[in-house]
């Protein structure tokens, strides 16, 4: 979607290299990323975008799931993490309305699997589900991608 927009792209990276496996995963994603994408690290929110001009650009957030996880681990409370997450996206959406940039959010659907056996796992699953619903309600288009095949929900 971002490539098809034909605009200069800002890639909002939300992953944190907490261990060697994650470092390798991030490195692989960096190598796969098109060279004309400008990467901005946004693991806890979008304040790093404040200094950037975003009009006539595409902004890709990859991914919402890591951002939610990072905020949950910082806040240690699902309700506080929810409020903080929707506040971050609310600011981003307000800016998008003013500047008109093309925004793509990538998230995971984790509510379709087995219920996690840990409290934190269940809290994350529920929190991400609420955030995904909040984002979908405010999005013009919503896709569900399975096996690389996009299904447009809205």
Regions found by a protein language model. Give the residues of each.
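Short coil/turn segments at beta-strand junctions that form active-site/ligand-binding loops
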Residues: 7-8, 55-57, 99-102
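Conserved P-loop
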Residues: 1-54
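Helix-adjacent hinge/juxtasegments
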Residues: 32-84
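Conserved RecA-like P-loop NTPase ATPase core
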Residues: 29, 60, 108
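Short, flexible active-site-adjacent loop segments at beta-strand->alpha-helix junctions, enriched
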Residues: 15, 43, 64-65, 109-110, ...
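Short, well-ordered beta-strand core segments
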Residues: 9, 59, 141-143
């Amino acid at each position: 979607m971002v490539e098809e927009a034909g605009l200069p792209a800002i890639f909002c990276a939300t992953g944190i290299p907490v261990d060697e496996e994650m470092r390798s995963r991030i490195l692989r994603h960096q190598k796969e990323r098109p060279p004309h994408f400008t990467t901005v690290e946004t693991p806890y929110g979008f304040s790093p975008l404040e200094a950037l001009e975003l009009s006539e650009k595409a902004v890709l957030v990859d991914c919402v799931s890591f951002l939610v996880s990072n905020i949950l681990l910082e806040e240690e409370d699902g309700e506080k993490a929810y409020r903080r997450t929707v506040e971050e996206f609310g600011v981003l959406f307000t800016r998008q309305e003013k500047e008109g940039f093309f925004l793509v959010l990538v998230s995971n659907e984790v509510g379709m699997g087995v219920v996690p056996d840990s409290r934190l796992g269940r809290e994350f699953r529920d929190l991400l589900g609420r955030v995904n619903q909040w984002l979908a309600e405010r999005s013009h288009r919503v896709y569900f991608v399975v096996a690389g095949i996009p299904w447009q929900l809205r």
